[in-house]
Amino acid sequence: MIPRIKKTICVLLVCFTMLSVMLGPGATEVLAASDVTVNVSAEKQVIRGFGGMNHPAWAGDLTAAQRETAFGNGQNQLGFSILRIHVDENRNNWYKEVETAKSAVKHGAIVFASPWNPPSDMVETFNRNGDTSAKRLKYNKYAAYAQHLNDFVTFMKNNGVNLYAISVQNEPDYAHEWTWWTPQEILRFMRENAGSINARVIAPESFQYLKNLSDPILNDPQALANMDILGTHLYGTQVSQFPYPLFKQKGAGKDLWMTEVYYPNSDTNSADRWPEALDVSQHIHNAMVEGDFQAYVWWYIRRSYGPMKEDGTISKRGYNMAHFSKFVRPGYVRIDATKNPNANVYVSAYKGDNKVVIVAINKSNTGVNQNFVLQNGSASNVSRWITSSSSNLQPGTNLTVSGNHFWAHLPAQSVTTFVVNR
């Protein structure tokens, strides 16, 4: 009798353990406070893509294998569809940008470029709040600087890369180590010189989405006509500052891109911290849903705090990005969805290629059983991929669609991407 009792207890323990694994950490279940309603016909912004920066001069170039990991969209690949590169002030260094850019283009990604400094002969120092070594573009060199940017566009084209866009200046309002621009100086360049650039023009790339830099462009018809993409960074920007009513009012026909960030920190070897890495997917969610951004671009692609670690493997932060980048492809459109159906649950939805893609983040310590309802649309089947403390983009079982809705379990401290085939 004793061995049989032990065997029964062991079987029960195994069953309980398996149930705990399926339900996630803590194995506590809650029913979501409300359904997630996905309105397939309520279209928001067109998505250009997700990606990151390659900066050979500062961080070394990506290797051939790392380029595949970054821009390929197979297993153990990030599926990035945007590459940002550096416009070196010295044209003798431009060749360093070519190989990774060509690889990105080969995979269907778009490439854009940002300058930190004009050529040294175009720059002068000035007294900025007591800093006599501050740099700015000489006022009589604006046309020459526009030609410098054009020369980079031409160089890349001659080397097999048609730049999608080029920026006027990286972080002109945080330029302690590069070139400062005042709002008035950027406005002048956008009005008088940006129209001569032979690529889409990005401006003003504020470090913190400070609107005093971009408001003058939006309020000036000529400057606005010469701007194709309003680009910004989100360092320290509160979510309450993500919406931009003036852009909504004046920016018809213009794109809105988030062109650089790392989040939530740049601590050494922080890329695999869990559940901290979930902050990345939540930040992307907020950029898409609260900010209506069309692109989300990380800082260095390969870094100890980035989407790819120095050994070339994808980090937990990278897998959080991949929940968007691998599935929400260029040209997809964000659609309306219940963004916060339960405490610490965040949902966004997109459509394209006859699919609906839903990204659901559960930052709580309990699993959530969530009902998803498709409005103005139907579904034939639902696939899903899950990243948690113990899994990385792990495929889950396909889900049953009943009418126009399906139930799904969102494990504690996890992110799940659902692909709904229509």
UniProtKB/Swiss-Prot annotation:
Pathway: Glycan degradation; xylan degradation
EC number: 3.2.1.136
Subcellular location: Secreted
GO cellular component: extracellular region; membrane
The entry's keywords: Carbohydrate metabolism, Glycosidase, Hydrolase, Polysaccharide degradation, Secreted, Signal, Xylan degradation
Temperature dependence per UniProt: Optimum temperature is 65 degrees Celsius. Half the activity is retained for 25 hours at 40 degrees Celsius and for 5 hours at 50 degrees Celsius.
Induction: Constitutively expressed.
Function comment: Catalyzes the depolymerization of methylglucuronoxylan (MeGAXn) from different sources. It cleaves the beta-1,4-xylosidic bond penultimate to that linking carbon one of the xylose residue substituted with alpha-1,2-linked 4-O-methyl-D-glucuronate (MeGA).
Protein name per its UniProtKB record: Glucuronoxylanase XynC
The organism of origin for this protein: Bacillus subtilis (strain 168)
Gene (name only): xynC
